[in-house]
């Protein structure tokens, strides 16, 4: 099938992602979509490591998706730009950046498990960016699959207004198809239509008629309430047409007021086509989402708006960087407005640097289709960008805009890495630079005491895979240390009028700076961990020196006063100070700012913070006592216990430092019958006895 031209009619474009828990079947679902829309001639299976969207070697080995590939495909004359996102918690960054550039999403759930911890986390991220979603309850052929239970957990755990628009026909091995509550018919996949290309539309089976009526009524009530005209018609006993119902569901879905629920089994090729119809019918096109809002470069209060049309000036967001074996660095961009031709010059408005676009591609997983120009509403990969990193805005040089970037969490776990030979040292530096470009949650620093390179990430699996990629892609041989927890430090009380005078009078020009500050605990909006305010009056410190005090204080925050961990959640208020006409300089005030912060922090009841993980253990009832006892011994706090599909589920908050090696311990305590998942929850204060140990270790006592 020849690729059609990029549709200029944006109402027929859908940019959407597939998001879910690790094993709910996202990649399989995506593979089926590619098969039915005619890109793939043979269905790739995760089981045999041939899935198209999983294109790094490790993804095919581990059977999980790590980096999200963007793919363009067509369905019934609509263009679908699909992004497959990883479901494993250690790859939050991938999910986060994709949600930022998607207009809608399909949330895939495992029909047996319902809402799992990871689904909750991904769902919350999607709420943050207000992404409209439809839900697909997958794996309906599994033993123990329960559609109604899954829908219930969406309400209970996600607080989502989930509205079924399909019901399953048959269950487990006898799962045959779906009841369509909008058209009031059944779609069944009979016999072994090996790949499920064809299905029959039949009457609703008699044993489901009553249930279908009940759910149809619920659906119609929701639909009617959304529109006065429909409400009058419905209350007057008139039938609503299929188009009216679809129009209302679309309106409610785009407003994130409801989440339509569908079901099927991607692996058994049942229910995928109706899900594609639902993507087109209910998820927003680039025209349905609010215009992109940004600000003028270096003027954050000057708002700039770009509508999704080709007439507006060019604006795009770089949301992912990947290393391609042949082209080198590939930058994925979402174009929000205007058009741009390959080879033209644009500006990276975030950094104020000029960039020239090399070739432009529309991607199919890891194959490329070259295009001449990129236009509003679409997703492309581009080569040739030098300075652009994730979250940067590319724009028209004459009409610049900086779009809202993304926030990335700090690493919670670190390992030291040492190259085995001199030649590995160079390869290591190169590989770290390349990987850090691709993944903003991968952080690197040099440990000033040991001289080792320390890499940080979002979890053990995340770091395993990064180290694995260094070995494979960059041929680095390195020794990796034991994982270390990324502790932080903060203060608990306000200290006032702390002063510090920096002076040095030795022949020639001296140095002089005096500062007086208040230091207090600070909790900013999400992500903000520091604030600086100057209350200096009457020119007691010249205005040009005040930023130096701020910079010095921020430098001092890199190494805390207790054990050298970064200081967070502080507010510094500069009250007063003094300067010397000749001897004062920016440097002098920077040193004073740094020293006064250290002095104040030591007086402000400093404490150590540790990362706390939300852990969920699923275990047979016989081992329940052992599991809880073990979590308690790891300083865990049990949050809740519940029953799910015949097993017990324990939810607890446990410090990350106590969770190393948990896999093996849990396996031996439960004879391999329990499993667990954990996601980062928050930082909290370390108990005094543990704090002493951490300080002793850090100070080498």
From Swiss-Prot:
UniProt superkingdom: Bacteria
Covalent crosslink: Isoglutamyl lysine isopeptide (Lys-Gln) (interchain with Q-Cter in protein Pup): 307
GO biological-process terms attached to the record: ribosome disassembly
InterPro entries registered for this protein in UniProt: EFG_II (IPR041095), EFG_III (IPR009022), EFG_III/V (IPR035647), EFG_IV (IPR047872), EFG_V (IPR035649), EFG_V-like (IPR000640), EFTu-like_2 (IPR004161), G_TR_CS (IPR031157)
Main location: cytoplasm
Pfam families referenced in this protein's UniProt entry, alphabetically: EFG_C, EFG_III, EFG_IV, GTP_EFTU, GTP_EFTU_D2
Keywords assigned: Cytoplasm, Elongation factor, GTP-binding, Isopeptide bond, Nucleotide-binding, Protein biosynthesis, Ubl conjugation
Molecular function in Gene Ontology: GTP binding; GTPase activity; translation elongation factor activity
Binding locations of GTP: 20-27, 84-88, 138-141
Segments forming domain tr-type G: 11-287
A GO cellular component entry from the record: peptidoglycan-based cell wall
Keyword tRNA processing on entry: no
Protein family according to the UniProt entry: Belongs to the TRAFAC class translation factor GTPase superfamily. Classic translation factor GTPase family. EF-G/EF-2 subfamily.
Function: Catalyzes the GTP-dependent ribosomal translocation step during translation elongation. During this step, the ribosome changes from the pre-translocational (PRE) to the post-translocational (POST) state as the newly formed A-site-bound peptidyl-tRNA and P-site-bound deacylated tRNA move to the P and E sites, respectively. Catalyzes the coordinated movement of the two tRNA molecules, the mRNA and conformational changes in the ribosome.
Protein name listed in UniProt: Elongation factor G
Organism: Mycobacterium tuberculosis (strain ATCC 25618 / H37Rv)
């Amino acid at each position: 099938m020849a690729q059609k031209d990029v549709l200029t009619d944006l109402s027929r474009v859908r940019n959407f992602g597939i998001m879910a828990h690790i094993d709910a079947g996202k990649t399989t679902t995506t593979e089926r979509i590619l098969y039915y829309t005619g890109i793939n001639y043979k269905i790739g299976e995760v089981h045999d490591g041939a899935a198209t969207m999983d294109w790094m070697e490790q993804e095919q080995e581990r059977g999980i998706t790590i980096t999200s590939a963007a793919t363009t495909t067509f369905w019934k004359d609509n263009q679908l730009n699909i992004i497959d996102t990883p479901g494993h918690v250690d790859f939050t960054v991938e999910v986060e950046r994709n949600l930022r550039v998607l207009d809608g999403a399909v949330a895939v759930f495992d029909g047996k498990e319902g809402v799992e911890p990871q689904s909750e986390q991904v769902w919350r991220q999607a709420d943050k960016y207000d992404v409209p979603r439809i839900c697909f309850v997958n794996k309906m052929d599994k033993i123990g699959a329960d559609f109604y239970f899954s829908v219930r957990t969406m309400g209970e755990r996600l607080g989502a207004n989930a509205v079924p628009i399909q019901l399953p026909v048959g269950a487990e091995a006898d799962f045959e198809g779906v009841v369509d509550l909008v058209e009031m018919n059944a779609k069944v996949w009979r016999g072994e239509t090996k790949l499920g290309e064809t299905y029959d539309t039949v009457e609703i089976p008699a044993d489901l008629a009553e249930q279908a009526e009940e759910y149809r009524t619920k659906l119609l009530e929701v639909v009617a309430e959304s529109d006065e005209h429909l409400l009058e018609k419905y209350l007057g006993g008139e039938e609503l047409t299929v188009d009216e119902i679809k129009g209302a569901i679309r309106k409610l879905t785009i407003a994130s007021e409801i989440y339509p629920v569908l079901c099927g089994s991607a692996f058994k090729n049942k229910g995928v086509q109706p899900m594609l119809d639902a993507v087109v019918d209910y998820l927003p096109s680039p025209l349905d989402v609010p215009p992109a809002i940004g600000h003028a470069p270096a003027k954050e209060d000057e708002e700039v708006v770009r509508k999704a049309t080709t007439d507006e000036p060019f604006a795009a967001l770089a949301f992912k960087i990947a290393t391609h074996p042949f082209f080198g660095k590939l930058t994925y961009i979402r174009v929000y407005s205007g058009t741009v031709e390959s080879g033209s010059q644009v500006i990276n408005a975030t950094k104020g640097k000029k960039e020239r676009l090399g070739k432009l591609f529309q991607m199919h997983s890891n194959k490329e289709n070259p295009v001449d120009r990129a236009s509003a509403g679409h997703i492309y990969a581009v080569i040739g960008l030098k300075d652009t990193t994730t979250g940067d805005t590319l724009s028209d040089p004459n009409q610049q805009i900086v779009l809202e970037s993304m926030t990335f969490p700090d690493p919670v776990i670190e390992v030291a890495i040492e190259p085995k030979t001199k030649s590995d040292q160079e390869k290591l530096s190169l590989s770290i630079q390349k990987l850090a470009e691709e993944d903003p949650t991968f952080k690197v620093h040099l440990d000033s005491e040991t001289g080792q390179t320390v890499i940080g990430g979002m979890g053990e699996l995340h770091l395993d895979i990064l180290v694995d990629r260094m070995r494979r892609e960059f041929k680095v041989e390195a020794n990796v240390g034991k994982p270390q927890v990324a502790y932080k430090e903060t203060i608990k009380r306000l200290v006032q009028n702390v002063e510090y005078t920096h002076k040095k009078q030795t022949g020639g020009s001296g140095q002089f700076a005096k500062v007086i500050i208040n230091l207090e605990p600070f909790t900013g909006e999400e992500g903000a961990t520091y604030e600086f305010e100057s209350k200096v009056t009457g020119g007691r410190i010249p205005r040009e020196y005040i930023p130096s005090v701020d910079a010095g204080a921020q430098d001092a925050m890199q190494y805390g006063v207790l054990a050298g961990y970064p200081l967070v959640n502080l507010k510094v208020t500069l009250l007063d100070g003094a300067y010397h006409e000749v001897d004062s300089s920016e440097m002098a005030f920077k040193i004073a700012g740094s020293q006064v912060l250290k002095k104040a922090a030591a007086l402000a009841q400093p404490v150590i913070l540790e990362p706390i993980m939300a852990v969920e253990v699923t275990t047979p009832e016989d081992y329940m006592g052992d599991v809880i006892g073990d979590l308690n011994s790891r300083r865990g706090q049990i949050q809740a216990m519940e029953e799910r599909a015949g097993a017990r589920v324990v939810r607890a908050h446990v410090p990350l430092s106590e969770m190393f090696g948990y896999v093996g311990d849990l396996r031996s305590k439960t004879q391999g019958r329990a499993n667990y998942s954990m996601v980062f929850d928050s930082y909290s204060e370390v108990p005094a006895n543990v704090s002493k140990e951490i300080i002793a270790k850090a100070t080498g006592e």
